[in-house]
């Protein structure tokens, strides 16, 4: 029965689905552009009817182009690859304004009734935050031949513009750094040159705030986003994990523990390095406190996103903000305490802490939506011995303090890359882990047992940015994203050189002040969990 539902790729008379057959999403305002589309060029896909048509394709960084003559497809020849539900109406839209339902979309009810079938608002928000996480990869200098390896290639003031993401309406408020002087050697990137920008530091992501008034109105609030860099393809960092739980020490309960490598990455600092003089934790607490004070009185949300190891840091930092009560604000006029909601969009993330950590996140109201591919191995570690799927996990932790017990936090959105007709079969584990592939799967997911069908018209060429996951008949070369001439420019002597960067954004001068303010919040009125600045 199941086999009859599958499309046969070996049949030469069959063709792949045309992008023009995919239904257009409905909008309340048809003149308003789709704000979640990173590349606004319309993607065209290659029919499989004649292999000679490949030569007519020109691949660029933004789209795959096909001549107008090729757009005349015979609809009778176009079939969907996977057919699970013939009654699926992919044109169904949530007609409520996002500004009215944003708390629900951000997980106030743990996404109940929004994932199956997939809510149209939620789909676009997952994609939007996935792209904000992907920006960490697209802007990171991976080149070991550059003395700037390990930095962000763009200054904060031009970050979103350089990445063609200015339409999202965010502005970076600070960059995040971490010391590489910890036991995760396969995660950090270092230059092979002797003279480098920093011996210890690696750029880890950014904090940004929504400043565009139209977007604030559309979303219904001012959004503060924290995006963490992970690992775009290489999975060697997994082998660096010691599978040792370390007390979080962000609150009063020593039984709340997180994986030791993640803890070190988040809390360690290097006094001799300008970029690592504050730990990643201190940078986060300081900046979130500063922004919340600055925008006091407004409707605000805090959204944290990350992929792979970055997803682990996203959950840890969200928990930390809530545990330290930095998101609890007192209204200046009424004196009423309000709590800013915290949401995490995690992509392909590992387990972070023990069951007590998971339970404490739930108590604090930290909402986590974990987007995973069932074929990806990263979400299965650490915690192979004892995890949330075990019936007796709580007994192991409470009775014998079992040291290798881990539990996932939040709600899981389970995807399967074999359901996409655009992706090829592969045994390469990095493909199943790829962030762009996850975003692609979200675009076509409609619920369990429903056929895969793209909705937002997001360019499928983006999948092959850093891998070779698309089927070859779509004419998109692998690993196509790179800077022009790999960043080399001609100097005044006519020689090709790596251009100097005048400024590498470091820590704002008021970091220590706002950090101390954040720590004071945790100790005021008996709210608990605070630390003096010198002890953090």
Go through each PLM region and give its residues.
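Serine hydrolase/lipase
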Residues: 2-125, 222, 258, 264, ...
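General structural concept
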Residues: 112, 116-118, 123, 143, ...
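Structured beta-strand/turn binding interfaces of compact recognition modules in eukaryotic regulators
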Residues: 123, 129-138, 157, 208-212, ...
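Alpha-helical bundle cores of large, well-folded domains in eukaryotic cytoskeletal
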Residues: 129-131, 142-151, 159, 163-170, ...
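Terminal and linker regions of secretory-pathway proteins
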Residues: 130, 140, 147-158, 388, ...
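A conserved cap/lid and substrate-binding interface adjacent to the catalytic center
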Residues: 167-169, 173-305, 324-336, 341, ...
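Catalytic nucleophile loop
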Residues: 311
């Amino acid at each position: 029965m199941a086999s009859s539902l599958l499309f046969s790729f070996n049949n030469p008379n069959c063709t792949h689905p045309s992008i023009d057959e995919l239904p257009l999403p409905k909008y309340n305002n048809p003149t308003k552009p789709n704000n979640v589309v990173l590349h606004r060029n319309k993607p065209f896909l290659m029919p499989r009817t004649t292999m000679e048509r490949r030569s007519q394709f020109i691949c660029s960084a933004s789209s795959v182009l096909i001549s107008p003559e090729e757009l005349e497809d015979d609809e009778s020849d176009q079939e969907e690859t996977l057919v699970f539900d013939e009654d699926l109406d992919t044109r169904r839209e949530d007609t409520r304004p996002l500004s009215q339902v944003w708390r629900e979309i951000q997980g106030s009810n743990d996404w109940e009734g929004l994932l199956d079938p997939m809510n149209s608002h939620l789909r676009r928000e997952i994609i939007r935050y996935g792209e904000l996480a992907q920006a960490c990869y697209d802007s990171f200098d991976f080149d070991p031949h550059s003395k700037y390896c390990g930095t962000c290639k763009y200054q904060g003031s031009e970050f979103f513009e350089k990445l063609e993401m200015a339409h999202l309406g965010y502005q970076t408020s600070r960059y995040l750094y971490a010391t590489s002087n910890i036991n995760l050697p396969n995660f950090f990137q270092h230059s092979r040159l002797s003279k480098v920008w920093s011996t210890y530091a690696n750029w880890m992501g950014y904090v940004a705030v929504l400043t565009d008034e139209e977007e604030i109105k559309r979303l219904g609030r001012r959004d503060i986003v924290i995006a963490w860099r992970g690992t775009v393809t290489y999975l060697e960092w997994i082998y660096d994990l010691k599978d040792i739980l370390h007390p979080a020490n962000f609150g009063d309960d020593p039984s709340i523990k997180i994986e030791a490598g993640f803890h070190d990455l988040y809390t360690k600092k290097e006094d001799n390095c300008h970029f690592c003089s504050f730990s990643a934790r201190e940078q986060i607490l300081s900046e979130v406190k500063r922004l919340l004070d600055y925008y006091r009185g407004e409707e605000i949300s805090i959204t944290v996103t990350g992929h792979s190891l970055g997803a682990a840091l996203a959950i840890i930092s969200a928990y930390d903000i809530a545990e330290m009560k930095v998101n609890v604000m007192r209204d200046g006029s009424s004196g009423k305490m309000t709590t800013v909601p915290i949401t995490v969009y995690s992509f392909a993330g590992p387990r972070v802490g023990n069951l007590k950590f998971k339970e404490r996140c739930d108590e604090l109201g930290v909402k986590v939506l974990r987007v995973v591919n069932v074929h990806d191995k990263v979400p299965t570690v650490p915690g192979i011995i004892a995890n949330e799927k075990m019936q007796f996990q709580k007994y192991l932790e409470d009775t014998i303090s079992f040291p290798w017990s881990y539990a996932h936090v939040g709600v899981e959105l389970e995807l399967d890359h074999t359901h996409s007709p655009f992706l090829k079969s592969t045994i390469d584990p990095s493909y199943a882990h790829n962030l762009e592939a996850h975003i692609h799967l979200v675009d076509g997911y409609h619920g369990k047992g429903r056929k895969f069908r793209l909705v937002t018209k997001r360019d499928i060429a983006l999948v092959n940015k850093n891998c070779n996951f698309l089927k070859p008949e779509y004419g998109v070369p692998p690993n196509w994203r790179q800077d022009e001439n790999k960043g080399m420019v001609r100097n005044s002597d006519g020689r090709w050189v790596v251009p100097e960067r005048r400024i590498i954004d470091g820590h704002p001068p008021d970091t220590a002040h706002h950090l101390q303010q954040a720590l004071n919040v945790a100790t005021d009125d008996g709210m608990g969990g605070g630390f003096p600045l010198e002890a953090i």
